[in-house]
């Protein structure tokens, strides 16, 4: 390796850090071939991009839990209605049994 190129990595891989004099910009938002934004590898705070993804996953799970809780509340209402129906049917059956026993 040439001593004047101290700190440079010579490799065939595109993922090598290219020196700034070559026009490379590290950790900045750019765009892909289709013009869509490409986020930086490192956020301003120095945290990796995985941190917001975890937060997003957590938020999605919270939304899913809200939906599950709504469904559970609906099921509780349906179960209560069914219990009331069963109680009413049991009363009718008991009344019929008492009428049959009297006769």
Curated annotation (Swiss-Prot):
Main localization is virion
Which InterPro entries does the record match to this protein?
Hexon_assoc_IX
Looking at the record's lineage, which domain of life comes first?
Viruses
Q: Which ranges form a coiled coil?
A: 72-99
* GO MF term list: hexon binding
Keywords annotated in UniProt: Capsid decoration protein, Capsid protein, Coiled coil, Host nucleus, Host-virus interaction, Virion, Virus entry into host cell
Its name, as the record gives it, is Hexon-interlacing protein
């Amino acid at each position: 390796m040439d001593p004047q190129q101290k700190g440079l990595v010579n490799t065939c891989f595109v993922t090598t850090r290219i020196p700034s004099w070559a026009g490379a910009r590290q950790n900045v938002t750019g765009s892909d071939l289709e013009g869509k934004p490409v986020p930086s590898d490192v956020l301003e705070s120095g945290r990796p991009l995985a941190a917001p993804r975890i937060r997003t996953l957590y938020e999605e799970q919270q939304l899913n839990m809200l939906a599950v809780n709504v469904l559970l509340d609906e099921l509780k209402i349906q179960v209560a209605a069914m219990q009331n129906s069963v109680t009413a049917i049991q009363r009718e059956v008991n009344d019929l049994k008492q009428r049959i026993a009297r006769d």
